[in-house]
Amino acid sequence: MRRIAVTGAAGRMGKTLIEAVQQTGGVAGLTAAIDRPDSTLVGADAGELAAIGRLGVPLTGDVARAVDEFDVLIDFTHPSVTLKNLDVCRRAGKAMVIGTTGFSPEEKERLAAAAREIPIVFAANFSVGVNLCLKLLDTAARVLGDDVDIEIIEAHHRHKVDAPSGTALRMGEVVAEALGRDLQKVAVYGREGQTGARPRETIGFATVRAGDVVGDHTVLFAADGERVEITHKASSRMTFAKGAVRAALWLDEKPAGLYDMQDVLGLI
């Protein structure tokens, strides 16, 4: 049995991950659940927190104390928290599945450095559907080339703290790479006032934060006379949780390295 730990276990995504781990039919099991050290829920049963029944796994506030209890840590938290957990896992030789978004380029370099010592799956989105969309976006960009205007529109719930979403940025990276462009130079994040005519080479991003939207992403390829839209809409966090658990199982026996969901799904 693959021993899995979940950090951020008392949050919305953490609870969903706990449920997803327990749906593997015994292939994997939750052996540790971690949240903030100051959480009033420390000591509570992880299964009861996730409303799936008692599991006998108490919530702890310290990854280091639980590090001997798991083979792989699934982390959907905050960059600062993830990087602390990364240091613990690197020293202990534990694998990680990272779904945290909002990393700076320098922080991503720290992930890459740690991946020289431990296996890590790092992805902006663990949905199978989104990763299929990334493959389709690469194809669409190469076929449509420089004859289209490209816009990326994403929507999430009011509680999401980073914008644009990591998934939207990854979509932009895929499209830019396919077209031989540098996303940092061509990205336009929102528009206001007298912007002038739209330069063809730019890739625009528009962000919506409202209600309880789990995650909607649309990439628009607009030409004169026609347009192509590639859209993914998530209706449940379980979509991401199942993908993360799939990645955790896939990492078994994998050598050190930085992988993503394209590797897990065999799309590369």
Curated annotation (Swiss-Prot):
It is found in: Cytoplasm. Pathway: Amino-acid biosynthesis; L-lysine biosynthesis via DAP pathway; (S)-tetrahydrodipicolinate from L-aspartate: step 4/4. It catalyses: (S)-2,3,4,5-tetrahydrodipicolinate + NAD(+) + H2O = (2S,4S)-4-hydroxy-2,3,4,5-tetrahydrodipicolinate + NADH + H(+); (S)-2,3,4,5-tetrahydrodipicolinate + NADP(+) + H2O = (2S,4S)-4-hydroxy-2,3,4,5-tetrahydrodipicolinate + NADPH + H(+). It is an enzyme of class 1 (oxidoreductase). Its main location: cytoplasm. Transmembrane segments: none annotated. The keyword Phosphoprotein does not apply. GO terms for biological process: diaminopimelate biosynthetic process; lysine biosynthetic process via diaminopimelate. The keyword Oxidoreductase applies. GO terms for molecular function: 4-hydroxy-tetrahydrodipicolinate reductase; NAD binding; NADP binding; oxidoreductase activity, acting on CH or CH2 groups, NAD or NADP as acceptor. Belongs to the DapB family. Catalyzes the conversion of 4-hydroxy-tetrahydrodipicolinate (HTPA) to tetrahydrodipicolinate. This is 4-hydroxy-tetrahydrodipicolinate reductase.
